[in-house]
Amino acid sequence: MARQKKYSGKGGARKKNKQKQSVAPRRRVEFKYKGFTLEELQEMPIKKFMEIVPSRQRRTMLRGITPNQRKLVMKIKKARRLTNRGKEPRVIRTHCRDFVITPEMIGLTFGIYNGKEFKEIKLVEETVGRFLGEMAPTRSVVQHGSPGMGATRGSMFVPIK
């Protein structure tokens, strides 16, 4: 016959106390980028925004924009106008992975090309100051299946099902 554990009675009391405590609702922490709120960032001129981003992004922005990036800016402005009217803008598809995410792009959905397909990404507050390419990785982990018949020397002696 199996021996039973002696019950000390302490564990049950702790559980009852935990049930009595009420859990406070979690408050969402207000987003800040380098001490600025999203509203302050959106009102900020682009020159001032360039001063607070890291040096790599600042250097990219100082070099100017290419014709492809200019097209992307026009698409962003068009999508912003649609959202101001209350319409849902379409996904903005782009190959520009080296474009810095600015505060005016927050809330829009982008299709970023990763070399094979367009990854749909909805930009949130935490992505400000990063590159679009960081949001759509170009490499993925390959999951190989089991090797087929004749793939290895040892499989020559395995009977076929």
Swiss-Prot record:
One of its GO terms (molecular function) is rRNA binding. Gene3D superfamilies: 30s Ribosomal Protein S19, Chain A. Pfam families: Ribosomal_S19. The keyword Ribosomal protein applies. One of its GO terms (cellular component) is cytosolic small ribosomal subunit. Keywords: Ribonucleoprotein, Ribosomal protein, RNA-binding, rRNA-binding. InterPro entries: Ribosomal_uS19 (IPR002222), Ribosomal_uS19_CS (IPR020934), Ribosomal_uS19_euk/arc (IPR005713), Ribosomal_uS19_SF (IPR023575). One of its GO terms (biological process) is translation. Residues 1-19 have a biased composition (Basic residues). HAMAP family: Ribosomal_uS19. Protein S19 forms a complex with S13 that binds strongly to the 16S ribosomal RNA. This is Small ribosomal subunit protein uS19. It comes from Methanococcus maripaludis (strain C7 / ATCC BAA-1331). The gene is rps19.
